[in-house]
């Protein structure tokens, strides 16, 4: 079968923002158990804000964005993540560097980059804890 270039990618994803919350990720993907996330980072990117949500954009050469890596095992899961991220984001290839000392130390993967109007993003920091409290999700999956 020819590979569909528009098919969602499976494999390692670099997640940042709301998707770093294990309970939210479990909900979106309807996972039977808590997802295994590895602390990770991307180099050469920057996080801005799109409204209350973080927006990953190209950054300076040495700029680092920290997040979590998650292994997406099915196209259905990749599609659910893309739907959650909306059309304001597009999946893009990236080089994920792990921060937990485990192997492999880095790997090729996928992330969601902001694809909306650059005029709509602002400088600012996204705080997952504050967002979870605002959404009434505080501590929902942190036991």
Predicted stretch roles:
Residues 1-143:
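Glycine-aromatic micro-motifs
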